[in-house]
Amino acid sequence: MFSERTLSPPVESAREAYAPELLVYDAAGDFETLPPAQAEELGLIVDALDPSHYPAEWIPPTGPDVLERYASTTFTIGMPGDGSVVWTRQTTPPIVLVKPRLEGSPEGFVDFLLAEAIVECSLDVPEHFLGFFESGYRDLDAAVDLGPAGTYQIAAALYDGWIGLHTREEFASWESDRSDLAGQWRDAGARLEGRVESLPGAVARGETSFADATELACSAIKHGLDLPKPFDALDTDAYRDHASAFAIEWADRTFAALSD
């Protein structure tokens, strides 16, 4: 099910700098959430498993089943929206899993995704947005009022943006000693720039949903791009410092304005 991945020199350098104990393995099959039996197989690789769980009351009554399962005592690795590279600290040592969907992608792009996961895993941050919002997820759900799937998408986007406020400082610092990775970070941002600039018009014309726009804008934060209103309020020290409380307040104000 899992095979150890050989890392390129730039990625190995990032691992040694940020999380030298971290393991990187390829998964045999694609997944959103790793089936529990397969997740348990990680016990053959790592020293210990430490499954996370959260209070059920953090989740609204209409919350998606996948979120309820994540909050339970079921050992859960990976969630919808996590992308092609997944990291977890529910194992000792922590581990990064690479999905086979990345096969055929440009090597430099894959290297950046791996380095990004290593940096994120090294931070003292929750593994998932539920640990970020905690009981405030119910408040976010009430503010967003887009249904379970819409709230999930907005929450994941806001958490991704908050993480980006922390990681982009590290990415920018690579210009001198990990220039290949820094170049991939800049290139990825350049590919997003035009789409981000056109977001207000795309939303106004109904070409992009507000949830999709939030996801794109928040993904641009880690690249240091200029964001249009109302997303620019998320690219601030206030959001970095006040975290989920700021995100909920932003959602409340923003969706109230959209409904006017």
Where are these regions (language model features)?
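Post-HEXXH active-site segment of zinc metalloproteases
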Residues: 108-109, 122-157, 161
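A metal-dependent hydrolase signature that marks the N-terminal structural subdomain at the beginning
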Residues: 1-77, 257-258
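Short amphipathic alpha-helical segments and their helix-coil junctions
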Residues: 92-98, 136, 140-147, 226-231
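Pan-zinc metallopeptidase signature
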Residues: 179-260
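Short acidic alpha-helical/loop segments enriched in Asp/Glu that coordinate divalent cations
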Residues: 127-133, 173-185
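Active-site scaffold of zinc-dependent metalloenzymes
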Residues: 61-114, 118-128
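Internal, well-ordered alpha/beta segment that forms a basic, Gly-enriched binding/recognition surface
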Residues: 165
